[in-house]
Amino acid sequence: LLEKGIPELTMLEIAAKLKISLRTLYEIAPSKENLILFTVNNILNKIGKKAQIKIENIHSPFQKLEIYLKTVNKAVGPKFDIYIKDLNKIKNSKGMIDYHEGYITSFIEKLLIESIAAKEIKEIDTSAYAILLGGIGRDFATKKNKKKILKSPEETANSITDVILAAIKLEQ
């Protein structure tokens, strides 16, 4: 429904398309905005879970970091554009997005610390790098910045991430 334009539909029309009662829909989400936030939150949780699954059997913290970042950068890819394009117009969306970015940033910092301990990367300010790497996709996904970059926010974030990771990686 989000792909087809939930903002254009009434709650009654959404309930009919989902084949549920209006009462049930209001129990799930008291408004269209809450329904959109609920849906986007679930999408972001699925991306995060997929990222965790992809790295669970990898031993190298640095390889985990590379794979994790590529996976979570999908949240700003073209496939998810429809979900996030008007998200900033919805009250409370910033808090939800900040929560996900905070989780990602914390996990990235953990992997950076583990990478230093494993002597896979240089000694760096892990907090600063985690903040940068955790928010890079979001920065490129803004309307203002999207117009300035040549590729999608996901491709651009991955490209810049590769440069940053190459700069801190120790030669084995």
Predicted regions and their residues:
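C-terminal peripheral helix-coil segments that are non-catalytic and often amphipathic
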Residues: 74, 106-118, 135, 142-172
